[in-house]
């Protein structure tokens, strides 16, 4: 077995983990994007640039523009235009592939599957590309993805409404806010026309022509074989921060702390073998 750590995800958490682990063991950092920083921070972010410099100084092998597909028998199947399709040997896999907002099913929204309901990442990229999702969109959630989508919608002169079950969240980026309300259902014929919300037995209907799902972050799971339930047996560690409000400094701190836990676990595995 090759004594090398494989890290999938070159966002802030992945970079922070790589910067720490590479001081102890040979490390390879893999990301499907051709640049560092992930989809939320970007390659120009100062924290990402600083962490990448530390990784380079420690001899981290960067495989950007490369997707990790399958983890099996301490080998990672990777694919990319430069690497092709091949297996990469590693003694341990660290998955730092980030998070995603909950789906309509995970939010337990009742109603038919209607057009005009978008995951936050899709809504953001469409809006940035010039697509107008609607005139009166509703954004479910109030974290960084909700803010990012709202600011993009504002450039298209959309009157965005933010709804969140957390009454303490700051939402100064929205035109209208419904804090402390729980979204429970979607209504419309073919396309979404209204969102139903509930609070303390009261039910309200919010008219809209688009809904963006940007709330309650959940961990990505994109590598076949890297399953959380079998992580102990498969030499896999997961480093994913579920906070909706954490900034880059918070995520870097989280990644460094997680690296210490990974090192402790690897030492335990080595001692057992």
Features from the language model and the residues they span:
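Residues forming the flavin
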Residues: 1-273
